[in-house]
From Swiss-Prot:
PANTHER family: 4-HYDROXYTHREONINE-4-PHOSPHATE DEHYDROGENASE
Keywords: Cobalt, Cytoplasm, Magnesium, Metal-binding, NAD, NADP, Oxidoreductase, Pyridoxine biosynthesis, Zinc
Oligomeric and partner information: Homodimer.
This protein's record includes keyword Transferase: no
Protein name: 4-hydroxythreonine-4-phosphate dehydrogenase
EC class: oxidoreductase
GO molecular function: 4-hydroxythreonine-4-phosphate dehydrogenase activity; cobalt ion binding; magnesium ion binding; NAD binding; zinc ion binding
GO biological process: pyridoxal phosphate biosynthetic process; pyridoxine biosynthetic process
Amino acid sequence: MSSKRIIVTAGEPAGIGPDLVLALSAQDWPHQLVVCADKALLAQRATQLGIQVKLLDYQRDNPVQAQQAGTLLVEHIPLAEPVVAGQLNPANGHYVLKTLERAAKGCMNGEFDAIVTGPVHKGVINRAGVAFSGHTEFFAEQSKTPLVVMMLATEGLRTALVTTHLPLAEVPQAITCERLEQIVHILHKDLVEKFAIAEPKIYVCGLNPHAGEDGVLGMDEIETITPTLQRLREQYGMQLVGPLPADTIFSEKYLQQADAVLGMYHDQVLPVLKYKGFGRSVNITLGLPFIRTSVDHGTALDLAGTGQADAGSFWTALAYAIELVDKKAQ
């Protein structure tokens, strides 16, 4: 199998993102990795961390080759101002967005086969005068994708969400038949096309305690979730199990058979995922016209430049991207 190109964005320059991408130089990789960041920032952070790495300028027209240990290809995006590890600077907010724009455009024009994103700081980007709610929404806008699905995965568990960063009080009204149907279609399609699962089995959480208990604890299951799932089963032959109570859906007897668990809201499924795989889980954006994976943690400003950052989630994100790229090439 020929090598592909994966672009890696370093995220917030004052956080641990630069530390994480520099750590990638410690080993060989089967595909070519292109780090999208300020080259001088990487050189400075490498010196701070005592990492010996050769930073090479990325040339699009050069042959695609597997990544060699001790080197990193860099697509240079200049910072607005110098960076001090651990100290946020709104002046560099636009720099972060430029790295994401470059990565998205490169994937959409076929230059890159996947994006792996380091952690960003939403607050400092907004303080720079840019309305930014996260990578997921940004890439959806860049690719003109009307609806995307957030998946978080770790070994033995894939979860996806019907609603994401929404106040809990607003969740019930956001779960409509139309939205649930769209989310299930995207999840099912990407499990087939990106994960190469021919007939995925999706387990679906109810919204209310005990999945509503026949309407005693809420009518959302009866009025919205159950009829939508039944319609999808009948029309498309999808294997959809549920709605099941969220307090039992994560039992081993279900997880052994589930290709993915669909939760209704953020904190319904993510505590289980992070308990099961903290530091080894990955965020995958479904529905985009390209592969995008990311760490499941923040910028950890207090660890930047210290050598104490845990690269587990970042390496897992890259491993998932490589797996999905390889499956796409088959």
